[in-house]
From Swiss-Prot:
Catalytic activity: 3-methylbutanoyl-CoA + 3 malonyl-CoA + 3 H(+) = phlorisovalerophenone + 3 CO2 + 4 CoA; (E)-4-coumaroyl-CoA + 3 malonyl-CoA + 3 H(+) = 2',4,4',6'-tetrahydroxychalcone + 3 CO2 + 4 CoA
Active site: C166
Gene Ontology molecular function terms on file: naringenin-chalcone synthase activity; phloroisovalerophenone synthase activity
Biological source species: Humulus lupulus (European hop)
Keyword Translocase tagged: no
Name by which UniProt lists this protein: Phloroisovalerophenone synthase
Effect of A232E: In strain: cv. Osvals's 72, cv. Cluster and cv. Nugget
Protein's job: Involved in the biosynthesis of prenylated phenolics natural products which contribute to the bitter taste of beer and display broad biological activities. Polyketide synthase that can use 3-methylbutanoyl-CoA (isovaleryl-CoA) and 2-methylpropanoyl-CoA (isobutyryl-CoA) as substrates to produce phlorisovalerophenone (PIVP) and phlorisobutyrophenone (2-methyl-1-(2,4,6-trihydroxyphenyl)propan-1-one), respectively, intermediates in the biosynthesis of the bitter acids (alpha and beta) acids.
PANTHER family the record matches: CHALCONE SYNTHASE, HYDROXYMETHYLGLUTARYL-COA SYNTHASE
Amino acid sequence: MASVTVEQIRKAQRAEGPATILAIGTAVPANCFNQADFPDYYFRVTKSEHMTDLKKKFQRMCEKSTIKKRYLHLTEEHLKQNPHLCEYNAPSLNTRQDMLVVEVPKLGKEAAINAIKEWGQPKSKITHLIFCTGSSIDMPGADYQCAKLLGLRPSVKRVMLYQLGCYAGGKVLRIAKDIAENNKGARVLIVCSEITACIFRGPSEKHLDCLVGQSLFGDGASSVIVGADPDASVGERPIFELVSAAQTILPNSDGAIAGHVTEAGLTFHLLRDVPGLISQNIEKSLIEAFTPIGINDWNNIFWIAHPGGPAILDEIEAKLELKKEKMKASREMLSEYGNMSCASVFFIVDEMRKQSSKEGKSTTGDGLEWGALFGFGPGLTVETVVLHSVPTNV
């Protein structure tokens, strides 16, 4: 007869406290573009300067984006060597894939190295790896390649997430929370890496959604380490606690945001009413998440909202009557990097905790105790993660 019960085994396997973010790292390519110069560059390299009306429309898109600069892996030299990437609908998937299956894990590795450095623990302590990208797809996946590049243990437990889009930053936190809280001692390395070579193409009068993508998206990678029961004796210190996580599909939103992999690469599709769909439905997610905590004033929480574009942030602010400073971290990230899809929210988390410390705020969450992290993406899918900040002076 066994000396222990299943219940005893399960109890021993589970962590005592909540999952926490223990470290954050980010990385971007070296190639930086000023947004003000991008329309001239884009129409020149795609040999589309004769499309003067469309160029004016694109210039207005770039001006309204509120983006100052973006980092892009694709250089003019890349495009000269592969001119079919500059055509609107030319077969080019193989060229894109050959580049991305190498570069996506490499950029992710750089962000992970920075997170591991901040964490200060040997990488042999990493028990799980979650890798997320919408830029490429391969077998074995980018998770395998990144684990090899980092020199992680062969026994590290890997999760590979492909083709999720802009809500994925919330999703990876939800998965990491479940892993960390149900596996005592687990240390989960999250890596989100995006390179827009998958969607770069010339302009078309028939597909203005393509121009929206060209005006908004940037390249970048972010990484966080998640674990429960931080070990203060070795210097582990939480940055945020993960309290709850939820996902929902918004009503009447089929086709609002979509991406399709074709012979011409990844095509991007967007309905005009995306900001309205999100702003009209977001309060339901907030009520479900914060009613158990006793919070119903959305100005009393800190905000980490995926910046799909300025219109989304504007309409959420207006609908919920938020003070302008609530979206400060999201707007700052959008301005400095553009929309980096799944990698974006962790740049914002990083900005939030750094600014809180710099400005002498009492907590990592802009001086507030509770906050919400939101991801918005294809579906239309919304991820909601409730965060609990920690004191900055500990």
